Amino acid sequence: MTTEKKSYALPIAMMFALFFMIAFVTGLPSPMGVIVAKQFGATNFQSQLGFFANFIAYAFMGIPAGIMLKRVGYKKTALSAITVGFIGVGIQFLSGEVQSFTVYLIGAFVSGFSMCMLNTVVNPMLNTLGGGGNKGNQLIQFGGSINSIAATITPMLVGYLMGAEAGRTIEKANPALFLAMGIFALAFIVLAFVKIPEPHIVPKAQIKEKDPHGPMSFRHFILGTIAIFVYVGVEIGIPSTANLLMTQPLTNGGLAMDAAIAGSVVGTYWLLMLVGRLLGAVVGAKVSSRLMMGVVSSLAIVFLVIAIFCPLDLTVSMPAMQSEGGFSFALVQVPLSVMFFVLCGLCTSVMWGSIFNLAVEGLGKYTAAASGLFMVMVCGGGILPLIQGFVADKTDYISSYWVIVVAVAYMLFYALIGSKNVNKNIVTD
């Protein structure tokens, strides 16, 4: 038994690497949006198209990825996802060589297919490699922490590589893209030569009984899918627009801040999400998902409204990385509004888990199908920031956060009212 556990150490390490890659590649459109705004003269709407291209892939691949997992198993699904991810990042690198915004968007779209497939496979695969139970859950939680660390590092790294505004080109981000392709290549090589248990492959000939009901038969689940849709958009839109606000020139309504400093501030948002998840894990056993969701949604609305009405010339000190004079950290002055946007990371950190728990409560045998539909609704991470970018073009960056306020208000409604199961008459055993 000991030997078998040791034999899984390497694939487990590769799963952790893939957890890192999910956040790293998913987070790239934020700093890349700053780059394309400068290099291609993209509007705020256009600069968010990277997120749209990345997340809209979930709408196409969410359900097929789940079917693929059942048909061919963990290993082949993971290897396929890694291959697609390598190609997607490679296309983004190529976009810098040919100076093409369209090629960049194609790369982001292909990368989105990979991220959807990886999100489908890494959690159950890591749980299986850990032997299930507490050990499997422990590995998943550790993987989630690595995911948060990657989300923190991405804007900081690319922001540092960007340097001064005049030199913001995709080519400057090449070291980050090479790192991503290198990790993908290493993970592929390791997983290709390692045996992995496949407990959940479903034979093609298996006959499925027809069921008159499904997850969409439950009102609280339908409303929950909308909540997930807007949640992912909120999680992405808050830091992404803040990054644009800080880095864009004064003539475009921005603050013309150093990209490395802005990246560090945005990185703090993702770091606070890690802190929030750890706190959520501690209190989760004592506090209901409904109460937790209600509290964090209310707090997020308070933070957002304060940020919107705070004058931009009112500043506060925050720790940040500087690109001038080499790699260094220092306290820098940032608008108080930005600080409150960053604090929203504490609130968004526990929203996914809370919404998921509320939406699948009472679904019983329909829970697996519900998970696949949830993955489809992740596409909200590409659509809501696009809407926010459009509003920013028509008004200004700060005013665009009213889009986020409306989305969070819906999540508060879902926590207090929409999450109640009114279809308890449906048999779910």
Regions found by a protein language model. Give the residues of each.
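Extracytoplasmic gate region of multi-pass secondary transporters
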Residues: 29-30, 216-267
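Central cavity-lining transmembrane alpha-helices of secondary-active solute carriers
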Residues: 49-67, 267-279, 380-383
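Conserved MFS/SLC helix-loop-helix module at the cytosolic interface between two early adjacent transmembrane helices
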Residues: 60-102
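Extracytoplasmic
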Residues: 10-42, 119-123, 238-246
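C-terminal ends and interior cores of transmembrane alpha-helices
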Residues: 83-98, 299-330
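Intracellular juxtamembrane helix-capping segments at the cytosolic ends
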Residues: 117-131, 348-364
